[in-house]
């Protein structure tokens, strides 16, 4: 929202928080991403909720990992986690889309770009709308409404310990389908945890040889894993091109030889010169 800050008293960012249980939205305005300002906004969110949360999930930005926020969370006994995957915080990202859509409709209707005056009204409207994920309004959700948790062992274990795997690479919306969709690095599954996740090993054993593994933080869920069996047949395309280039015959450049056409052109030029000279002399004599 930085492009609208001139019309909204310098408000550049919006701190969006969502309660995963009730899907209730809490939004605070920020003029910068400084740690002190973010910590104060989080404190206001805690007061609005009424209780401090047990866990906070966020990205690994410096606006959350600084001394001010760390002190606030330690004071309220709150744990902060940040996923290392590209896919993270999907619930709040979807909430951002809903919030931006409603703000854009309001600004289009009013023919201006000022939204701070009605921001909390828009948030209140979202909280009073039925959420498709839970089938209820977030403001109507009470503790105990969803007493049946998801089964822990609902995901089947796809890989065994010792399997060599690759990680699925992030794909864009317009990426070509024939391009490689997996990382070049190969990992070996070392252990399986509950809920189902696979921890990578520090080294991989291929044909009895110990090969160091690339550094990888955290555990990997089976959803982004792909089995990799033909390890010995992997090679980069550029090496194949060089190997093939040795057998390609070189194309020799052949200079064009002077043929009969060139001689005829020279003879025609000489004849033209003599004819023009003769005609010129005859005209002077007369």
From Swiss-Prot:
Residues 1-146 form the Integrase catalytic domain. Residues 252-263 have a biased composition (Basic residues). Residues 274-286 have a biased composition (Low complexity). Residues 252-286 are annotated as: Disordered. Transmembrane segments: none annotated. One of its GO terms (biological process) is DNA integration. Signal peptide: none annotated. Residues 264-273 have a biased composition (Basic and acidic residues). GO terms for molecular function: nucleic acid binding. InterPro entries: Integrase_cat-core, RNaseH-like_sf, RNaseH_sf. This is Putative uncharacterized transposon-derived protein F54H12.3. It comes from Caenorhabditis elegans. The lineage of its organism: Eukaryota, Metazoa, Ecdysozoa, Nematoda, Chromadorea.
